Regions:
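Extended recognition/assembly regions associated with phosphoester-bond processing machinery
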Residues: 1-227
């Protein structure tokens, strides 16, 4: 099966178009947010697994569905929704979500927010065996190993030049047993940062043997104009 959700740069309506038809082929797409998501049940050798698909949420979206709830922040909004879809503690559960979890490392590629207003508390996800997160470009865990951003497969700005992209593989064993591994995703053309004088950087010896088809961000240290 394939599971997909809409993120903060997506149109939830467009992503969800044809979702009912796709579900017949085991391609599950998050619908437009209309309330807490129902689990998608699967079964493997260890028993049932519930998959929850939660698209990117803003407080206004949740207030519209639950007008009687006191929702002032992103954490309030997410908490309101997750309380209504709390997983069965006797069953294994996976949540796919797209939020900025407090404590995660961001970079310039992500959409900035003032004062971290869009941060949510990692503790909100505690009931799930694994939380597959999107939104941040750097692969990383947040707090526990099973609360993880897979990161983007490619680098989208030079602020990501030193990131090591990877694919995350998750294996669910019996309840409480989760095994994680990663595989590197080396780019065909990397992003690299160079710093030095014009003469240093144009000397053939400085780039001999390097990948000359990479994308470069160059900082010249010359104190005089280069003719």
């Amino acid at each position: 099966p394939v599971f997909a959700i809409s993120g903060n740069h997506d149109s939830a309506e467009r992503v969800a178009f044809g979702a009912h038809l796709l579900a017949g082929s085991q391609v599950y797409v998050s619908p437009v947010f209309e309330g807490a998501p129902a689990p998608i049940p699967l079964t493997d050798a260890y028993g049932p697994v519930d998959i929850y698909l939660l698209p990117f949420l803003k407080p206004a979206m949740v207030r519209h569905i639950y007008p009687d709830e006191p929702i002032e922040s992103y954490s309030d909004a997410l908490g309101c929704v997750l309380r209504r879809c709390a997983p069965d503690p006797a069953r294994r559960s996976v949540l796919v979500a797209h939020q900025f979890v407090a404590g995660a490392a961001a970079c310039e590629s992500e959409e900035p927010s003032v004062g971290g207003l869009d941060c949510v508390d990692a503790a909100l996800f505690d009931g799930f065996d694994y939380v597959a997160l999107g939104h941040l470009h750097s692969p990383q865990k947040v707090g526990r190993d099973t609360l993880r951003y897979c990161g983007t497969p490619l680098k989208y700005s030079f602020s990501e030049a030193h990131q090591h992209k990877s694919a995350t593989f998750v294996e669910l064993g019996p309840k409480g047993e989760v095994t994680l591994s990663t595989a590197p995703l080396p780019p065909k053309h990397d992003l690299r940062e160079l710093r030095g004088s014009y003469m240093e950087l144009t000397d053939r010896r400085s780039y001999a043997g390097t990948a000359t088809d990479d994308y470069l961000h160059i900082t010249l240290t010359d104190e005089q104009d280069v003719p």
